[in-house]
């Protein structure tokens, strides 16, 4: 890869999109390239990206509900407005114009990828899931590269016009901080004794309602042993309801911790003796 490329990345909505994008961005930065992110400031990327030290340009777009087809009109209006703004920014300020654009799926990538296509800027896509999303399928035909995490996805993109030569099986990038997790540091941060058993339960950044319900039903059994500690990540939407349903006493809360999201996943996984999760793009 040429030195000092200016790279724009669009990723957002869930950690399954954002964290693989950050993993790639951190490696690109380590190699001397400049990376700018585009995403929704009010969603997860609006927090995680600046925390990782990357420039962040907020873009407002909305998805649409297939059961309410009239929401498509609003979604298309927001898309056109965001795409137009990006095109104008790239034309007005050469320092913002990227050498390459990378989309990590979800509707947030559409204005950036479409702007790149309009201006003749090469773009690449990354698909984390076993079932490609609508945004990646719609933009697959013009992509210079499509990186996939599941080999079976290749056929789907070929049906949407992508040449087989552009599709590469890469897997999902993992952030260095996850691989560098430290058990002692994680347990100290969670205040879990060395000899205790730590169960970590999470359903991805959005949570998993069924998993949360199951953990609630198991609370008494889990805390019956004095040497068992639990870290339960509920997802933001389920957090308040889960906290109310658990109704933890002060004594119970010392061993059963509830969070909406796990920021320090590397240390948490290293600290855990058992992880209870569900299959997702990254989790």
Regions found by a protein language model. Give the residues of each.
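Conserved nucleotide-sugar phosphate-binding/catalytic loop shared by glycosyltransferases and other
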Residues: 4-12, 31-85, 170-172, 236-238
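Active-site-proximal region of nucleotide-activated glycan assembly enzymes
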Residues: 34, 55, 117-184
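Donor-nucleotide binding loops and adjacent catalytic segments primarily
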Residues: 48, 52, 183-185, 192-277
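A short helix/loop element that forms part of the nucleotide-sugar donor recognition site in Leloir-type
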Residues: 71-73, 179-191
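Glycosyltransferases and closely related glycan-assembly transferases
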Residues: 85-102, 109-124, 137-142
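Hydrophobic acceptor-binding patch used for acceptor engagement in glycosyltransferases
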Residues: 101, 274-275, 282
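Short glycine-/small-residue-rich Rossmann-like dinucleotide-binding loops
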Residues: 105-106, 151, 204, 235, ...
């Amino acid at each position: 890869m040429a030195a000092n490329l200016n790279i724009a990345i669009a990723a957002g909505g869930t950690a399954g999109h954002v964290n693989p994008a950050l993993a790639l961005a951190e490696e690109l930065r380590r190699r001397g390239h400049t990376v700018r992110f585009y995403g929704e400031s009010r969603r997860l990327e609006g927090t995680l990206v600046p925390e990782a030290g990357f420039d962040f340009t907020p873009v407002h777009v909305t998805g649409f509900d297939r059961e309410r087809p009239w929401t498509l009109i609003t979604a298309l209006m927001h898309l056109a407005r965001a795409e137009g703004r990006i095109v104008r920014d790239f034309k007005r300020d050469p320092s913002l114009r990227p050498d390459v654009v990378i989309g990590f799926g979800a509707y947030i990538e559409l204005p950036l990828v479409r702007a790149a296509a309009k201006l003749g800027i090469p773009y690449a896509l990354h698909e984390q899931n076993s079932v490609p999303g609508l945004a990646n399928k719609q933009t697959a035909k013009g992509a210079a590269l499509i990186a996939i995490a599941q080999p079976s996805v290749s056929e789907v993109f070929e049906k949407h016009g992508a040449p087989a030569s552009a599709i590469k099986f890469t897997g999902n990038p993992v952030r260095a901080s996850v691989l560098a997790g430290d058990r002692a540091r994680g347990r100290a941060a969670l205040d879990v004794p060395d000899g205790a058993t730590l169960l970590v339960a999470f359903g991805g950044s959005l949570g998993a309602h069924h998993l949360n319900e199951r953990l609630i039903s198991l609370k008494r059994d889990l805390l019956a042993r004095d040497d068992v500690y639990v870290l339960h990540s509920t997802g933001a939407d389920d957090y308040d309801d889960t906290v109310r349903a658990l109704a933890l006493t002060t004594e119970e809360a010392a061993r059963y911790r509830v969070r909406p999201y796990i920021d320090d996943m590397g240390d948490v996984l290293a600290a855990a003796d058992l992880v209870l999760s569900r299959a997702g793009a990254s989790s």
